[in-house]
C-alpha cells in the first residue's frame, strides 16, 4: 500500500465512494511520470503512452506534459490518442482493415506494419503523406514465461523475423518496432538490444527510428534505471542516427490506483468461506484469471494455520470467477469494503459487461485528498452494446 493511499474505511470524505469503483491516485501517477521524465532527460530516448494498457483520458493532460505522445493499436485508439492526448500518434496493429487505414493515416505520425504482406498491400496508401512507415520485427527473444503474453513464442504471428527479410529492407520502410517484453527488467532491455543488433544489425544503418515497444517496468521496485540509461546510451553511441522510442503502458500506471469492492454475502464451507463481491474477476480483472496471478488485497495476507480462509467470489455466473486464498486480521462481514491494489493497467481497457454485471464506476483521488467521480455506467451501456 502506498504512503499516499488513504484508508477509506477511516476517512469520512472517502467512505461514500461508489462500489464497485476504479480509483486512480493522482499523486502516484505523477510520481511515475517523473521517473519517465528523468529517463528522457538522461538518455537519448522518447517515451510514448501505450493506450492498450492504460487509456484513462481524463488524466491525459497530466501525462501530456512529460511524454512524447501516445501509441495505438487500432483506429479507435488512434482517434482517442489524436483527440485527447495530442502530440505524436504511433500506430501498430497485427492487421489493418482496408476501411480503417484511410482513417488512421490523417491521425498518425508513424504507422507500423506487422508483416511484409501488409506493407506491400498498403504501401501505396502512404505515398504523398507525411506518415513514417515501419515494420514490426521479431527479435526471437522474450523473457516472458506465459505463452499468452509471449510475442516471440515459436510460430508467433507477431512481427517479421530476420530470415523473412533475406537481406533486403523494403523501400519506404523508415523504422522498426520491437515489442517482446512484459513487465520486464533492465537486463531484458539489454538482451533485447543485443538481439536486435545480432539479427537486424545490417538494416539499422538504413532506418531512421527504432521503437522498443512496451513491457519495460521501469516504475517497479528493483528496476535499475541507471543501468538502463547506460545501456540505452551505449546503444545510441553505436547507432547515433537512430531516434529511439519506447511505449510503456503498464509501467506508467503501475501501482497508481485500486478497485474498490464490497462484500455482499458470506458462504461457509468446510474448506473455506466464500466472500461474495460486487465485482467480477472475469469481467473487471481478466488478467487475474488469464495469467493467472493473485492480486494484492489491502489488509489481507496469505493464510496461515488456524486462519479463516477466504475465497473471493466474483459476481458473474462463471464457475471459475473467483480468486484466493486470503486471510484477514478480523472476520469479514457483509458490507465490508475490499480494495484490490494496482488495478489501473489492463483492467479498464479490458472490462466487459458479461452476464450484465454492474460495471465499476471510475474516479480519481486527487492530490488534495478529494475524490472526483469521472464516470458511471448504467443499463443503457449494457443494452446499447447489443443492438
Swiss-Prot record:
Pathway the protein acts in: Amine and polyamine biosynthesis; spermidine biosynthesis
This enzyme's EC code(s): 4.1.1.127
Domain of life: Bacteria
Keywords: Decarboxylase, Lyase, Pyridoxal phosphate, Spermidine biosynthesis
Tagged with keyword Manganese: no
Deletion consequences: Deletion of the gene leads to substantial accumulation of agmatine and CAPA, and lack of APA and spermidine.
Lipid biosynthesis found in the keyword field: no
MF terms (GO), sorted A to Z: diaminopimelate decarboxylase activity
Pfam families per UniProt: Orn_DAP_Arg_deC
N6-(pyridoxal phosphate)lysine carried by residues: 52
Named cofactor requirement(s): pyridoxal 5'-phosphate
GO BP field: lysine biosynthetic process via diaminopimelate; nor-spermidine biosynthetic process; spermidine biosynthetic process
Catalyzed reaction equations: N(1)-[(S)-3-amino-3-carboxypropyl]agmatine + H(+) = N(1)-(3-aminopropyl)agmatine + CO2
Function (record text): Decarboxylase involved in the biosynthesis of spermidine via the carboxyaminopropylagmatine (CAPA) pathway. Catalyzes the decarboxylation of CAPA to form aminopropylagmatine (APA). Can also decarboxylate carboxyspermidine and carboxynorspermidine, but not ornithine, arginine, lysine and meso-diaminopimelate.
Family: Belongs to the Orn/Lys/Arg decarboxylase class-II family.
Name of the protein this chain belongs to: Carboxyaminopropylagmatine decarboxylase
Protein source organism: Synechocystis sp. (strain ATCC 27184 / PCC 6803 / Kazusa)
Taxon lineage: Bacteria, Bacillati, Cyanobacteriota, Cyanophyceae, Synechococcales
Amino acid at each position: 500500500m502506498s504512503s499516499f493511499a488513504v484508508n477509506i474505511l477511516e476517512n469520512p470524505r472517502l467512505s461514500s465512494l461508489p462500489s464497485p469503483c476504479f480509483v486512480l491516485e493522482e499523486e502516484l501517477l505523477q510520481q511515475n511520470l517523473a521517473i519517465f521524465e528523468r529517463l528522457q532527460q538522461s538518455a537519448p530516448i522518447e517515451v510514448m503512452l501505450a493506450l492498450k494498457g492504460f487509456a484513462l483520458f481524463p488524466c491525459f493532460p497530466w501525462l501530456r506534459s512529460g511524454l512524447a505522445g501516445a501509441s495505438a493499436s487500432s483506429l479507435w485508439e488512434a482517434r482517442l490518442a489524436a483527440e485527447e492526448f495530442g502530440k505524436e500518434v504511433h500506430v501498430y496493429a497485427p492487421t489493418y482493415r482496408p476501411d480503417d487505414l484511410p482513417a488512421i493515416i490523417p491521425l498518425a505520425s508513424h504507422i507500423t506494419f506487422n508483416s511484409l504482406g501488409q506493407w506491400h498491400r498498403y504501401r501505396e496508401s502512404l505515398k504523398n503523406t507525411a506518415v513514417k512507415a515501419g515494420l514490426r520485427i521479431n527479435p526471437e527473444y522474450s523473457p516472458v514465461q506465459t505463452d499468452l503474453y509471449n510475442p516471440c513464442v515459436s510460430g508467433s504471428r507477431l512481427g517479421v523475423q530476420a530470415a523473412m527479410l533475406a537481406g533486403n529492407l523494403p523501400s519506404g520502410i523508415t523504422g522498426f518496432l520491437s515489442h517482446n517484453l512484459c513487465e520486464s527488467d533492465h537486463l531484458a532491455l539489454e538482451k533485447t538490444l543485443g538481439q536486435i543488433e545480432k539479427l537486424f544489425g545490417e538494416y539499422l544503418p538504413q532506418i531512421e527510428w527504432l521503437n522498443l515497444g512496451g513491457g519495460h517496468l521501469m516504475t517497479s521496485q528493483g528496476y535499475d534505471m541507471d543501468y538502463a540509461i547506460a545501456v540505452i546510451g551505449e546503444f545510441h553511441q553505436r547507432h547515433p542516427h537512430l531516434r529511439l522510442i519506447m511505449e510503456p503502458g503498464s509501467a506508467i500506471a503501475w501501482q497508481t490506483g485500486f478497485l474498490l469492492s464490497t462484500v455482499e454475502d458470506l458462504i461457509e464451507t468446510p474448506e473455506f468461506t466464500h466472500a461474495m463481491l460486487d465485482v467480477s474477476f472475469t469481467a473487471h480483472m481478466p488478467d487475474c484469471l488469464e495469467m493467472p496471478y493473485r492480486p494484492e488485497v489491502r489488509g489481507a495476507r496469505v493464510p496461515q494455520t488456524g486462519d479463516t480462509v477466504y475465497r473471493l467470489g466474483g459476481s458473474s455466473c462463471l464457475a471459475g470467477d473467483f480468486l484466493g486464498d486470503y486471510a484477514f486480521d478480523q472476520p469479514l462481514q457483509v458490507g465490508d469494503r475490499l480494495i484490490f491494489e494496482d488495478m489501473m493497467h489492463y483492467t479498464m481497457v479490458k472490462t466487459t459487461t458479461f452476464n450484465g454485471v454492474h460495471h465499476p464506476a471510475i474516479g480519481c483521488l486527487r492530490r488534495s485528498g478529494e475524490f472526483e467521480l469521472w464516470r458511471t455506467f448504467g443499463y443503457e451501456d449494457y443494452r446499447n452494446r447489443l443492438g
